[in-house]
Amino acid sequence: MSEKAYKKIRVVGCSVQNMEKAIEIAVAKTTDGHHGNGWFEVVEMRGAITDGKVTEWQATVDIAAKVD
Amino acid sequence: MSEKAYKKIRVVGCSVQNMEKAIEIAVAKTTDGHHGNGWFEVVEMRGAITDGKVTEWQATVDIAAKVD
Amino acid sequence: MSEKAYKKIRVVGCSVQNMEKAIEIAVAKTTDGHHGNGWFEVVEMRGAITDGKVTEWQATVDIAAKVD
Amino acid sequence: MSEKAYKKIRVVGCSVQNMEKAIEIAVAKTTDGHHGNGWFEVVEMRGAITDGKVTEWQATVDIAAKVD
Amino acid sequence: MSEKAYKKIRVVGCSVQNMEKAIEIAVAKTTDGHHGNGWFEVVEMRGAITDGKVTEWQATVDIAAKVD
Amino acid sequence: MSEKAYKKIRVVGCSVQNMEKAIEIAVAKTTDGHHGNGWFEVVEMRGAITDGKVTEWQATVDIAAKVD
Amino acid sequence: MSEKAYKKIRVVGCSVQNMEKAIEIAVAKTTDGHHGNGWFEVVEMRGAITDGKVTEWQATVDIAAKVD
Amino acid sequence: MSEKAYKKIRVVGCSVQNMEKAIEIAVAKTTDGHHGNGWFEVVEMRGAITDGKVTEWQATVDIAAKVD
Amino acid sequence: MSEKAYKKIRVVGCSVQNMEKAIEIAVAKTTDGHHGNGWFEVVEMRGAITDGKVTEWQATVDIAAKVD
Amino acid sequence: MSEKAYKKIRVVGCSVQNMEKAIEIAVAKTTDGHHGNGWFEVVEMRGAITDGKVTEWQATVDIAAKVD
Amino acid sequence: MSEKAYKKIRVVGCSVQNMEKAIEIAVAKTTDGHHGNGWFEVVEMRGAITDGKVTEWQATVDIAAKVD
Amino acid sequence: MSEKAYKKIRVVGCSVQNMEKAIEIAVAKTTDGHHGNGWFEVVEMRGAITDGKVTEWQATVDIAAKVD
């Protein structure tokens, strides 16, 4: 009952909008039973520069979901 | 005169909107003389996932304020 | 041909709007050949507090551009 | 023959007893071929506080198992 | 409603028994509103050696409690 | 279109030759859809010593591949 | 008897003289029961530059004092 | 008189019982004048897994002893 | 006479051969007075994967050269 | 107006006197527009030993100056 | 029987060839009972630059050997 | 000839004067062949507080000396 376990997987989400959207894409694209409840931890934030402008936001997140 | 000191306290702010709002809540909810001028440093960013969606943004910040 | 090098420079961008804007200012203000294509990595996020409110967002980023 | 590889997965184990039990639960609950021989590395230790008492021990571990 | 904040304080607990007891002492000795619900994070583990034997376990923990 | 995500998995490659070979083994032995294009990041480098000589090179790498 | 706890607070001391003086100011300005015996740990060292000269030394220290 | 020095050595202790026992073994097995008074700092915690069960606890500790 | 200073710049070198070659390219491509004597420090090692094979080695190094 | 940027450069200062002097030399020897107002952050402290005595203090600092 | 301990010592190996050779020199030059079986962990990689070329590879490794 | 190795040992020096003196004591008290030429790296700086005043400066340094 009180014995629980959570598995963490590391995902990089990419968005042209902003960092929050990049995180949300990382969460949305995560499959194999990680769509339920859980939490995320931001590990790294990067992005692409094209012609001197930020053109992509990239967020690496650890996504945790309960192990059944 | 030139001898100053600043105290830092660590606070986790939570918001359903975005990371900047979570940081602003951490700053706003901080009491005991920390409402004046100072600065913050982001220590950690996490969040909650419900039904496969980001439902809360959590920012841990160190908030610094002058010691009188 | 396959031998390339990228130089990274560390820049702190400041904005009254939000963290993404602070990053974009760091990228835009970077000179000496770093205006082309490349990438950035967020190193640190801080900000200023005035009268108990966040009044400036400060993002330290490493900006990478190709060495000709 | 001498070419081996090990895959690491990150798991959070939770126990009401102590940290060692939390680690053992993380190991026991790990599935997909990780039940064999291998090793674990403690990444983080946290826990829950209820009514001013520690009520749950949480250990995040990297669990390594041989890739066939 | 959804706007919450948690304050973290750093405490070193000392015990002659074991690490879990040292953590529990850190939690128990924490005052000013931190006696309610919340969580802890282990930051550091050390101890004293007397006559070649471990004679004290010392755990540094961050203790988080809700800001009202 | 611009919404992409990459999953990272952590693998330890072992080789009797050198560190680059250990990294290549980690990449080659990685399964479940990670055989396509992507990148790796070196996390840790270790090795075995037998009779005072290095007899195995071990490289821990994060291997990233696109999530379909 | 053997159950003790120490609380750590983080303080930034500023001095125009040198780093040791900045640390001593951080210790001296710390209030609420931290004036007794204990220890400090240096967390960060920074300073201000005016007209190309170091004009202020800033030391961030964790100051630990016994919890009664 | 007030001039003292302590030497730190890094030792990995292994036990089939638990982490505290692994630390105590590291302290007990340390030779060359480190058997006296001093302190230890936990650097890393790992362990072995056999048939899906934790079969050994391994604690890496820095052990400090006074230099005569 | 005894007052010296060294400037460090961060460069990413890329090679199809191996990590040492990637470091040598980073050193060779570094301009503006850094071609003299000095030293380098490896900061990060990554690489590209194409069709499941390592196709590029990338080494980030800090290159230090004397300030005249 | 409120859009500002600061560039950081990493410099190692060396002095036979003490650490503060090594930092001041790093600041003084820094060229290309970094002579104005700004700040420094200590990154590393090392030194040389000759015949069992400290003969040089070396401080690595990040020096930040406003980008015009 | 199951109570074992390993001592780690930190050694910097230098080679004009490559990083693996630098590591092997660190292992070979290590004395006082560390010539047996054990393992190493790479802690840092640096090198010397002469006339704009890499002229020495330096690897700092922790070398672990069983305590009898 | 070009094959060299340096051994590092970790020492905590204590002084009532200042940090540089604490470092010099760590270097001076180091025995077994470490009295020759080499270098040190500052790992940690702490100190004791008595009656609200800094009464001891403690510097942990890695001291490197050539292996014959």
Label for each model-derived stretch:
Chain A
Residues 4-40:
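Short, well-ordered alpha-helical segments
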Residues 41, 45-68:
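A cross-kingdom feature marking charged/low-complexity
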